[in-house]
Amino acid sequence: MNEKRYLKWYNKIGYGSGDIAGNVVYAFLTFFVMIYLSDTIGLNTGIIGTLMAVAKIFDGISDVIFGSLIDKTKTKMGKARPWMLWPYLGCGVCQFAIFAIPTSWGKTAQYAFFFIFYVMLNAGFYTANNIAYSALTALVTKNENERVQLGSLRFVFAFTTSTIIQAVTFGLVEYFGNDAAAWRIVALIYVVIGIVSNTISVLSLKELPADELDESADQNIQAATEKYTLRDAAQIGRASCRERV
């Protein structure tokens, strides 16, 4: 007997497009924020690296918190979709802010500005969005083959987006003037792309009714606290570089 299917092809593509949103934030941040901060703003890379490491403390705590909150959420949109939709707006604001550090401020204020928005992005908005996105596979289908397909499509979109971000970003920055304002414009372009693709992903799927879901859905929400991180983005980027070589 064939296992029941829950998703059409456009539902699967729509889900995969959610990793366009994830990578216009994190591929961009992972591969270019240090260059922007050191070469354009003039901050010390050692201090920036330390601030990023400290931020991971908050990140580890927030993983557990948001996993629990999503598990307890009950809305007309479902458990995960609201957490995927609205926090991404915060991702956009934080990403733009990180690439819009006021050049007239003193160094201490600039470090503080970066750290605050980096923590808000990495440990707050992105964590909520990405854990919800990861949990969604268990909430929109009970078909194991479809869940595998969703995961595969997610990787394809992530890999492709990361590769494109690496390939075009320097060219875009140079085109817009190769200065602080140019980085702001490029960040804004990526934010708009991210918001659009994330919204499409959310609206392309509908969570199954609670009485139709089994216990595996709750287990998958907890497992989703292992979210897609900066390290994962870097690994995808390195893999794409090897493919081009």
Language-model segments: which ranges?
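Membrane-embedded alpha-helical bundles of multi-pass transporters/translocases
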Residues: 2-244
